[in-house]
Amino acid sequence: MQFITGPKLNGAAASTGALSPEVIAVYPMTKAQESLWLAYSMAPNHTLYNLSLKFVFNQTEAASDGSIAIRDLTRRHAILRSTFHGANQSQARPFVAEHNPDTATASFRIVPKPRDARGEAKVLGLLRTAVNLSQEFASRWLAVVSDREIELYLVAHHIALDGTSMSSISAELFKLLSGSPATPAEQPFCQAHMYEVITYIVRRFSSRRILTPFKAAFSASPEYQAAERFWLDQVMHVRPYKWITNPSSRPAPSKSYREIQTWFDFSKDDLAAWGSKYRTSWFRVAVAMVGLLTRAHTEPDYGADQTVTVAFGGRPAGLEKSIGHFANAMPIRIPFTEASRKTSGAAQVSFDNLVKLVSKQISTAKKHERYSILDLSRARASRGLETPRAQVAVTLSPKLSHKECTLYPVEGPYDLFFCFLEGDDNVTLGVIYDPIIFSTADVARLKDEFSSLRERSMTDPSFGVSGISGVQSHLPRLLPELDLSNVDEISAARFHAWFEQQALAHPNLVALHSAERNLSVTYKELNERSNRLGHYLREIGISRGSLVLLYLEHGPAVMEWIIAVLKAGAAYAVADQSNPPERIRSIVSVAEPVLVIHDQKGEAIREIIQESPVKTLDIRTVQIEKFSSESLEEVTQNTDLAYIVFTSGSTGQPKGVEIEHRNLSHFVANAFTSNYTTIGPGTRVLQLATFAFDAAVLEWSQCLSLGGTLCFADVPKALVGDYLADVIDLNEVSFMHLTPSVLATLPTSRPLPSLRQISVGGEMVPDNLIKKWRSRVQVVNAYGPTECTVVMAHQPQPIASDAPQPAANIIGAAHQHMKFYVSNDAFTRLLPAGEVGEVCIGGPQVGRGYKSRPDLTENRFAVHPELGARLYRTGDRGKLLGDGSVFLVGRIDREVKVRGDIELDDVERTITDVMPEVTAVSVQPDSSSTSLWAFVSPDDIDGDVLRNRLTERLPAYMVPSTVYALPQLPLNMNGKVDHKSIAANMESLIVEATTSGSSSSATPSLVSSGSTTCRSPSTSSCSDSRSASPAITSAVTRIWQDILGTKGLITTSDNFFDLGGNSLSANKLATQLRSEFSSSNITVLDIFSSPTIQGQVDLLCGSELDSYVQSKLDSLGRGRTKSPAKIVDSQGRSSPSTIPSGGRKSEIAIVGISGRFPGASNPDELYRLFRDRKEGISELEGSSGVLPFPGAIYVPRRGAIKDVEYFDPAAWGLKEDEARNMDPQQRLFMESTLRALQDANRVPSIQGTNNIGLFVGAARDTWQDATETVYGDEFYRTHRADLTPSISARTAYHLNLQGPNVTLNTACSSGMVALSVAVDQLRAGRCDMAVAGAVAIAFPQEGYVTAESQIFSPSGHCRPFDHRADGTLPADGVCALVLRPLDDAVRDGDKIYSVISGIATGSDGRLDKAGVTAPSPRGQADTIERAWKDAGIPMSKAVYAELHGSGTPIGDALELEGFQMARSRLGAANNRCTVGSNKGNLGNCEAASGLVSVIKMCKSMQYGVIPPVQSLERVNPLINPSLPFDIAQTDLPLSDDAVVCVSSTGLGGVNAHCVLRS
């Protein structure tokens, strides 16, 4: 298969000039064309979408003139004489402009057949030249002529023609050349434009099915909605291909452009036979095989699927042979997870089942092929989600009319592109690949594997794919495999052995991970470390039957010790360090451990056990290097103890639930075979529960037995609300188990794209909570008492929004080998299905009993007399359903008699059903037991409304007589509503509710009359806020009292958590503080870091003071960038506070750029200058004359812009003398702003209104110093400086920009500071679009005077980071960026150069600074830290930093120190990062230098490569060699999800930093 490819060529930028007068009709592009237009607009010089057709015929065979045939084709088909344009003032959408068929002339060029390689390269260049779609027709012709034959090429952009059209054109052309006219019936629209096509359709067809493609109503039709549901499902929970091939481990490819390998020629008979084996088309079998083959070469991520892009015809009936672009490339999900079936300890996928599912997907897709990728992108964007990038595609090109024709496929943007090309009797398969990702050897291996797979699929259609190399690691397996139907085999298995086998099978998979700590531990590392710890434990006397108590800080170390204890043959228990001493004492007393393992916080437990013989071990003293990393000999028996979990007892003493090894093994195996979770290799599981609870056992045992990754949070007790969402995003968590109370805090506004499954359990799950989440993720309602080993039943919830939702009371059927029974209360008779009684559980997950409590064990773990088997009595009341599942009614101990038998759980569930706003509820009988009281949260619940709704659902005696609304209900240690505590403290709770006006009378809650601004005259912080802000202190105290449910005295130094606060109440506190103090950004993490009223007042004081200053500035008409609040420590040092990530809503898209630079007249030329490592420095004539001081040196070099004097006044409505009087900075900036707006296709109307902001960083006006004006009268000339409008004001006048307007100067950081102000204004909604720009042009245009050891270079060269660096070099520059909120840009289909995720500015101040002009690493680090926190992206993700890099030896060294200081604060100290600077190419463009760096990053992201620095011999010796930086000395390829950053520093210490992503 042939393929036209090569390096990217230069070409004209996309243009959207005025329409030609020859245009006779315009009509909107199809959605498929719009998506191609968007790709073209972002890279107009690319030829990725060139589709080429080659004809070969003898000179003697050309009966007609080829040019006449081409002319006839051009007249006949409107698309061959059309141009393509972006939306403008008259057209709301991108559109096609059809030109007059009588005057339209096709591009047709004739060249002689080349005789050498140079000539062939020239022809190839002509074939690959990019086309300006708005100025030229999308198709062109090239004839390569020799004496004997003619090679005629038709090269068309894919936006105009698809493969079917090429086939039709080939037939028509041969007819025309042979003198035979095309049959009119074949081409009914041959001379029609689009309006006539529509008329034809309407006249010929009356069915709505045919008309809807031409009606806007399709987007509001049921068909469209059904299509949207289907296509959203195709990309739901799909993940990008993370290729196992490692490009960084091999030499850079010799070619940067895609290449093709021809793999196979298949006969059509063979393909037909292939398809018939699966009762579908061979193409669908091939799509399934491509999906399987590519998955085998990606990193495992079980539970997620990938997509393969498939082109659908998209041609309505009647247009089958029309010429144009109808192909619609859409993602088809390869349902690998759905196809897997769990048997014999492993998930299996049969190929025929996979084909069946793929074929079904494609069949449904064809019904919805009118829905476009643009529709899908917008639908995903509206949900806060991105559409996955197309990485793998499959296409089938139709047969051409003659064997003399050859079709060259488009190159496409894919990593792998499988192209099937139909011939007369055969089909050829060629594969286009990206050599940056795949080597030639990689593709050859893929070819061999494809061939082997196809051969096997021909002989055994139902073969299991787990045997395929690479696929097995994607399927969950319990190793070694065993018969999961055999109870004894499972009982004999061990969790730690399953983990160990995973480590042997997948040593490099990540077992433990923390994104916040930048920590990853592989299975091999965890296994070897736990083996060494196990050997150490055995040496110190720990053996079979021993019990070890772990008293460790929550984190990965706990997991290491749990595995080590189990491997040593012992059992473990965990005492949570946050527990009060009395509970820890009770746990030690019941557990009777032989060893307590502790960390640096072990003093508390050592005091408790000092009188006992229990040994202690401080993990800080353990030396394990001498111990073997080999596995330990297995010594445990099936009935040996594995762990003890402590639950609350009715007497207040904890109950120790004993779980044996066989119980744990059955939980893991039974949950696996019952499809409770979709955990497998690569699945990210959140470690949310404290290790003292059995929910943690669920997390680590399921995860580490099956190859998943257990993910830890830095502050696990704060895992609620936005912090929980942040941790999910940072760690790409896909599975988590949590209580409904915690799930209720998780914001549904966050996209959480990685999250696939939520397991909810531990308490009653409100139906409304399930409804919120089930359409987004797989929700399972999990059930299992601690005494029955975590979970033994689950009820999956349907994902489809229109599917009926089972009642939340239904907990599902028992897992394999487990069984539900329902007994009468006397425990003497088993009840049939439908009768209510006590739910009992039997099976091998039922635990041993309660430690040292034989009486309680005998009562709760009892042999049922009718069954003769040991059951666990749950205390839950419920009934069996016909399908074996259980319907829970409530707790036996919560059944009361109030004018009849009442299940309190039933009333509580009804309350959450009728009022979804209720997040927690406890119903209790009143003190006389004659009525019910309902305690609910939050405190704004209207009790009267709630009771009215209940009367419609419940009998009168079950409706609470009074509703008490509280900020939060008391919770027990498991995070569940503490009904016992509420029952015991009802009087105080009623007083609290009625005092705050939150009883059922629905009186509004008491709120503060208003916040008081804290202003401290002596300090920038409020460290003395006791005296400075009594109102704030009072308000915070009142909020504490409301949340903690106390009216007692609280001092400003009391710890919130010591008074009873927990993670849920901390989330509530942060929310209420933000509500009370609207200017604050307090997060739940701030509550943990500042847990006292005093600390929180300090945080609030800074933000409220900021609000005060901002309001004063606003009243003067001047905005400023809001400074973050400061946290002041005991030494008076300050550090930036946590700035919550804004998420996608705060991200800003760069949609247009322009500029003029030294040696480059536009951004593309600038990128080429960087790529070629050239200098843009100009050699200037003349000298400075008399030098101003001894030792002075005149250097006749400058980074000058060419033709700064050229300007067309008439184009701007200016007179010549008025223009001459203007500072050239103004003139050039006006032009640059206009070009940027044109580049963004966002030029405003001169007549209309808009809200476009303009923010300019400008250097000092030197034009007035260098010239005298003749413009204006004497008064004007006298006050010229005062009467000259600012650059932003004049530009706004001429371009009619009506939004906020600022001109500023902070020296070299001016442009970046202007960018920061623009971003702030966009985020605040003060403008809809913004232009951020900068300009620095000095006059006169001459060299500079310097001296040795001064800031300017005596050598006339700027060499950042180099040992030759001797200073910077002055330069000029002007640039402008057009900015829009990311959601707006995506919605409107803007081209997006880059996305600003975070940005910050800051000043050095006086601390840690040698002088006003000296740089401050601390000041720069503060600003960098703020920017990354604003972005909400881990700094470890930064692959490159474009630094200020001034070329001064000390300045460069200090800047790198500051950058590393910020990285250390943000947990990225050890990640290597590439750094660079553009000043070696250009010099220092002063006010424009920061934005020049941003434009460099934008173009680098567009071209996929960051160029190296201009020159580097050896690194500057002042730079610390231990810093983990690489100076960019070669091209740095960028991935599609690359994150980079830019720093800019102004003389005097004004710093700016921004974070950019692709």
UniProtKB/Swiss-Prot annotation:
GO terms for molecular function: 3-oxoacyl-[acyl-carrier-protein] synthase activity; ligase activity; phosphopantetheine binding. It catalyses: acetoacetyl-CoA + L-isoleucine + ATP = tenuazonic acid + AMP + diphosphate + CoA + 2 H(+). The active site is at C1308, H1444, N1484. SMART domains: PKS_KS (SM00825). It holds the Pfam family Ketoacyl-synt_C. Its cofactor is pantetheine 4'-phosphate. Residues 1131-1140 have a biased composition (Polar residues). GO terms for biological process: amino acid activation for nonribosomal peptide biosynthetic process; fatty acid biosynthetic process; secondary metabolite biosynthetic process. Residues 522-919 are annotated as: Adenylation (A) domain. The modification O-(pantetheine 4'-phosphoryl)serine is found at S1063. Residues 1027-1104 form the Carrier domain. Residues 1145-1558 form the Ketosynthase family 3 (KS3) domain. Keywords: Ligase, Multifunctional enzyme, Phosphopantetheine, Phosphoprotein, Transferase, Virulence. Residues 27-392 are annotated as: Condensation (C) domain. SUPFAM superfamilies: Acetyl-CoA synthetase-like, ACP-like, CoA-dependent acyltransferases, Thiolase-like. Its EC number is 6.3.2.50. GO terms for cellular component: cytoplasm. PROSITE patterns: AMP_BINDING (PS00455), CARRIER (PS50075), KS3_1 (PS00606), KS3_2 (PS52004), PHOSPHOPANTETHEINE (PS00012). Residues 995-1028, 1116-1144 are annotated as: Disordered. InterPro entries: AA_adenyl_dom, ACP-like_sf, AMP-bd_C_sf, AMP-binding_CS, AMP-dep_synth/lig_dom, ANL_N_sf, CAT-like_dom_sf, Condensatn. PANTHER family: FATTY ACID SYNTHASE, NONRIBOSOMAL PEPTIDE SYNTHETASE. In the N-terminal section; belongs to the NRP synthetase family. Hybrid PKS-NRPS synthetase that mediates the biosynthesis of the toxin tenuazonic acid (TeA), an inhibitor of protein biosynthesis on ribosomes by suppressing the release of new protein. TAS1 alone is sufficient for TeA synthesis via the condensation of isoleucine (Ile) with acetoacetyl-CoA by the N-terminal NRPS module and subsequent cyclization conducted by the C-terminal KS domain. TAS1 has the following domain architecture: C-A-T-T-KS-TE. The N-terminal NRPS module contains the condensation (C), adenylation (A), and thiolation (T) domains and catalyzes the formation of the amide linkage between the isoleucine (Ile) with acetoacetyl-CoA. The ketosynthase (KS) domain and this domain in the PKS portion of TAS1 is indispensable for TAS1 activity by conducting the final cyclization step for tenuazonic acid release. This is Hybrid PKS-NRPS synthetase TAS1.
